[in-house]
Amino acid sequence: MDDGFLTSIGNGRTIALMLKLRDGPCIMKDLKEIVLNFQSLKIRLNEMEKDGLVNVTTSLDGHKYVVVELTDLGREIAMLFSITNMAVSPNKNISEKSIDMKHFDTVVRLLRGKEYMVQREIVKNIKTFDTVIRVLDAMESDGLVIKEEVHEGVRQIRYSLTPLGEQIADVFESVHQKMMAV
């Protein structure tokens, strides 16, 4: 898969971080409620900073602490994700939604514009079968994909985006294009 296809958005919990930061700058330790492991949080924020979504600065106002805030690009993308979050399973918390899962971005953009995609083709692009199935099952639960089992000589499991799934895929593609333009 093309390295330019993958961004920090495809990492789990990135959208939840952006939605939290949309309210304003946060001290890094306050983001641990979203990404519980400090090392994972630090890595995620470094990737988001490299993608131009956040600025991470160290402040020495008596105590040393790390402040994280969205860049202009990050604010624009966070607004798109805020609308997306409201459209997808509005009664669920962001942590329960497929849109904030690791590899959702990759899966939804792979399916975008296609009539359907066979499960094994999706797995080929991500290489983690269990993760792909977890994401696809969550997407089906959120009403973003339709799963169809077909027996045409060989058993195939096909996935296609619902109309809402297509709209969400368009948002994620737009976000990807904005990030690649930086």
What are these model-derived regions, one by one?
Residues M1-I15, L80-V108:
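Short alpha-helical segments that sit at the start of domains
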Residues L36-K50, I126-D142, K147:
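Short amphipathic alpha-helical interaction segments
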Residues E33, Q39-L73:
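General nucleic-acid-binding
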Residues H63-F81, R158-F172:
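Basic, amphipathic "hinge/linker" alpha-helix immediately C-terminal to the N-terminal HTH DNA-binding motif
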Residues I9, M18-G24, L110-K114:
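Short helix-to-turn junction characteristic of helix-turn-helix DNA-binding domains
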Residues G24-I34, E115-N125:
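Short acidic, hydrophobic short linear motifs in intrinsically disordered regions
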Residues T58-V67, M101, E149-Y159:
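Short, Lys/Arg-rich nucleic-acid/phosphate-binding segment
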Residues L6-N11, S40, E96-M101, T131-R134, ...:
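Short glycine/proline-centered loop/turn elements that form peptide/ligand docking sites
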